[in-house]
């Protein structure tokens, strides 16, 4: 019996694994060392007692190591992602992805990592593709797009081939596992900042602790009154990370300089509908609720990357870029260059 197999047996007996032990087991999973029954038993045992932050961080670490290389110089820095865990079942427009495009138009380098929809009607990949940005760019082409436009989309299926070992298990279990949590933590790009939304407020501290292991300069973990976004219908619970230091506070729409809306005001549809709604916002003809929700999320990206001193300042900067057409024209540039690189 290998050491990883012995450690897996400990987890099945209810032992909470240290981060190094958990890395050992998850690394073995990425290498195909366990069969589906062993993987299912392990994931079920973790979920039954509750995944420990060290185990969440370990799973993310193992799958980042196993990911396809994204050839962006690690020492160059300045990359950010804005992403949510999903699971809030609210059916909103793709706020995070839209906000990534706003931030890119303002000089931020956004390496957006995402996948197709699983439980929602429109995943980040579905929206990006519908907007006209191809998903088949090579890692080298994605770096080129990032350098020239400040945006690239890293399609999770392309960068995480090791997920093939757990995909059948996840489909068969039909229950949440640690893999529902690590999607936002396994971006293959060398991030220095991140905005991470969680759909379950109970995950705020665990995800903040896991993110603290990623050696980021600045990050926000947010839960907005039932959404994995900054809320405009109620308060948002925030965990702000600067290095390994975590600060907790509450944020209201008024503090952002925005009005309040209902969750129903933010509901979208499938990727085609959401693309139309988001394009309308960028063209100055969209709904105010959509515009303000996107601006709030973009403000968080501007804040963690040092492009805004406060979240409220970031909101105003984002709103101005939307209003004056900067975002719409920049999206056209991204689409054009991405298609050229894909050809």
What are these regions (language model features)?
Residues 2-14, 79-85, 111:
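N-terminal small/glycine-rich loop or linker at the start of catalytic domains
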Residues 2-3, 7-10, 17, 62-68, ...:
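Glycine-rich anion-binding loops and their surrounding alpha/beta cores
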Residues 12, 43-47, 81-86, 301:
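Short glycine-rich or small-residue beta-strand-to-loop segments that form or flank ligand, phosphate
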Residues 41, 98-102, 293, 297-300:
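Short amphipathic alpha-helical face segments that pack within enzyme cores
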Residues 43, 93-149:
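A glycine-rich phosphate/pyrophosphate-binding beta-strand-loop-alpha-helix module
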Residues 50-114:
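Active-site cofactor/substrate anionic-group-binding motifs, chiefly glycine-
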Residues 84-89, 114-120, 159, 225-227:
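Acidic, glycine-rich active-site loops and adjacent beta-strand->loop/helix elements
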């Amino acid at each position: 019996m290998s050491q990883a197999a012995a450690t897996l047996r400990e987890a099945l007996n209810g032992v909470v694994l240290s981060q190094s032990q958990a890395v050992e087991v998850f690394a073995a999973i990425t290498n195909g060392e366990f069969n589906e029954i062993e993987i299912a038993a392990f994931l079920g045992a973790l979920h039954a007692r509750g995944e420990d932050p060290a185990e969440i961080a370990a799973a993310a670490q193992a799958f980042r190591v196993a990911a396809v290389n994204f050839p962006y110089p690690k020492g160059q820095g300045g990359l950010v992602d804005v992403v949510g865990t999903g699971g809030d079942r609210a059916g909103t427009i793709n706020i995070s992805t839209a906000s990534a495009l706003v931030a890119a138009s303002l000089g931020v380098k956004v390496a957006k990592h995402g996948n197709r929809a699983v439980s929602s009607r429109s995943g980040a990949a579905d929206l990006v593709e519908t907007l006209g940005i191809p998903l088949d760019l090579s890692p080298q082409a994605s770096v080129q797009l990032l350098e020239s436009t400040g945006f690239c989309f890293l399609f999770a299926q392309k960068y995480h081939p090791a997920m093939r070992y757990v995909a059948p298990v996840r489909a068969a279990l039909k229950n949440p596992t640690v893999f529902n949590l690590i999607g936002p933590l396994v971006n293959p790009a060398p991030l220095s900042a991140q905005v991470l939304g969680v759909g379950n407020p109970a995950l705020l501290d665990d995800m903040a602790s896991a993110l603290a292991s990623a050696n980021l300069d600045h990050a926000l973990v947010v839960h907005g009154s039932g959404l994995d976004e900054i809320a405009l219908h109620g308060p948002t619970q925030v965990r702000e990370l600067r290095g390994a230091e975590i600060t907790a506070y509450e944020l209201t729409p008024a503090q952002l300089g925005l009005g309040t809306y209902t969750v129903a005001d933010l509901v979208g549809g499938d990727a085609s509908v959401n693309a139309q709604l988001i394009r309308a916002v960028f063209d100055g003809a969209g709904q105010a609720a959509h515009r303000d929700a996107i601006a709030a999320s973009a403000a968080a990206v501007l804040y963690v990357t040092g492009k805004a001193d406060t979240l409220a300042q970031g909101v105003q900067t984002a709103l101005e870029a939307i209003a004056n057409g900067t975002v719409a024209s920049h999206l056209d540039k991204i689409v054009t260059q991405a298609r050229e690189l894909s050809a």
